[in-house]
């Protein structure tokens, strides 16, 4: 199997593993901060065990080399865990993932300011359409019982934080960022521990906590590894699968209808990003053909 095929498979399975994330939050019968604690703690422990098992302690030195930007990455990733749970608890799953779909747009903006990369005209046009889609989603939150603008704001924070974190990974590309993941998740769990009672009702939800953490750990690691072997447009297209699959999963299992405004705004976001990424993918493909000819 080539590195390219490996990258496609790893990224695809990474998307599949993170897709049920919002469903687990809905299924676990506990308060949001407790869910966030166990989500962070179990994912952090599992990633740490996997890192030690497969690479030993040699990657630990990355923690001492990543500097302020690396610790900022840890903060951003760690803070998204409670913010994600708060988002899912306060608005529809469809709203959350549709807002997440705008992540490449914010990543482009951060790349412009941090990496000094120019924003192509194609991306500028996409930003306008995606912004209109997000406005429609926000409006729908005032018209729908399952949606709320507070949850939308939490989802927006997670979207912006992940986009910033992805940009920092590119800034620190000479350093392995995987050891920072357990630090981020376990650091988040440590702080959340003082704001919740995580062992109340633990027996009732123990299985779901562990499975939830396993899915997050595997999905996070796969999405940190897979995109290194494929182009950014291909990675973006694969990650968009979650935007379609997650609300469908919750709709089928929990009968959560997102509302027409959310569907309309989300469709605008997904369609704009799909066209933009397909154009970029074809451009990269044409470029590679010219090089080989």
Over which residues does each language-model region extend?
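Hydrophobic/small/kink-forming positions within alpha-helical transmembrane segments
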Residues: 19, 74, 78-82, 104-109, ...
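C-terminal-most transmembrane helix of multi-pass membrane proteins
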Residues: 40, 51, 139, 240-293
């Amino acid at each position: 199997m080539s590195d390219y095929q490996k990258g496609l498979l790893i990224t695809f399975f990474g998307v599949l593993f993170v897709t049920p994330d919002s469903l687990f939050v809905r299924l676990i019968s506990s308060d949001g901060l407790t869910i966030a604690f166990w989500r962070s703690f179990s994912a952090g422990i599992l990633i740490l065990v996997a890192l030690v098992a497969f690479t030993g302690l040699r990657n630990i030195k990355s923690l001492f080399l990543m500097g302020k930007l690396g610790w900022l990455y840890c903060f951003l990733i760690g803070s998204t865990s409670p913010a994600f749970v708060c988002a899912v608890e306060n608005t529809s799953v469809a709203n959350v993932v549709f807002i997440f779909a705008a992540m490449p747009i914010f990543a482009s903006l951060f790349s412009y300011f941090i990496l000094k990369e120019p924003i192509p005209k194609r991306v500028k046009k996409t930003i306008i359409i995606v912004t209109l889609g997000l406005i429609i989603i926000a409006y729908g939150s005032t018209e729908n019982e399952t949606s709320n603008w507070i949850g939308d704001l939490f989802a927006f924070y997670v979207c912006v934080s992940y986009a910033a974190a992805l940009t920092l990974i590119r800034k620190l590309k000479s350093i392995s960022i995987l050891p920072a993941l357990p630090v981020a998740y376990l650091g988040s769990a440590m702080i959340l521990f003082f704001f919740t009672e995580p062992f109340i009702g633990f027996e009732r939800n123990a299985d779901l906590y562990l499975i939830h953490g396993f899915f997050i750990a595997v999905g996070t690691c796969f999405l940190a590894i897979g995109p290194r072997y494929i182009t950014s447009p291909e990675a973006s297209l694969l990650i968009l699968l979650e935007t379609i699959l997650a609300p469908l999963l919750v709709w089928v299992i929990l009968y959560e209808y997102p509302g027409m405004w959310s569907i309309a705004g989300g469709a605008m976001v997904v369609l704009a990003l799909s066209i933009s990424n397909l154009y970029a993918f074809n451009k990269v493909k044409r470029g590679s053909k010219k090089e080989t000819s």
